[in-house]
């Protein structure tokens, strides 16, 4: 899948995909002999994961740590689990604040 196809499918700009690759969120993206990116199934799973996490408001720094640890192997499983648990807790706090805001808006 080309960058244009991935961009359209996942509703992410090509610049964002290039940025994710540059900062290490999408490492090892395969390229054709002419240098054009060729996203495979694994790359697409990472894009879906990153998009889901970013849509939820998870910080890029946390995702970079997670991806870096993932590629270090199974011995980092607990550290990765901890990163996701911390981000999950932050999301619950954020969700609680949003619910309170919605309650106020509904009251007005």
Each PLM stretch: what is its role?
Residues 55-83, 87:
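Amphipathic alpha-helical dimerization/coiled-coil segments
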Residues 49, 60-61, 70, 95-98:
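Short C-terminal domain-edge/linker segments immediately following a structured domain
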Residues 1-65:
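Basic helix-turn-helix/winged-helix DNA-binding cores
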Residues 17, 25-26, 63, 69, ...:
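Generic detector of leucine side chains in alpha-helical contexts
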């Amino acid at each position: 899948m080309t960058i244009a196809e991935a961009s359209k499918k996942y509703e992410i700009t090509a610049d964002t995909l290039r940025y994710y690759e540059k900062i290490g969120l999408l490492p090892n993206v395969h390229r054709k002999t002419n240098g054009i990116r060729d996203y495979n199934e694994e790359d697409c799973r990472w894009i879906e994961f990153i998009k889901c996490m970013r849509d939820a408001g998870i910080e890029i720094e946390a995702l970079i740590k997670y991806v870096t640890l993932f590629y270090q192997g199974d011995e980092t499983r607990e550290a990765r689990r901890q990163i996701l648990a911390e981000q999950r807790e932050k999301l619950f706090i954020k969700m609680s604040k949003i619910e309170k805001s919605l309650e106020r808006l509904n009251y007005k």
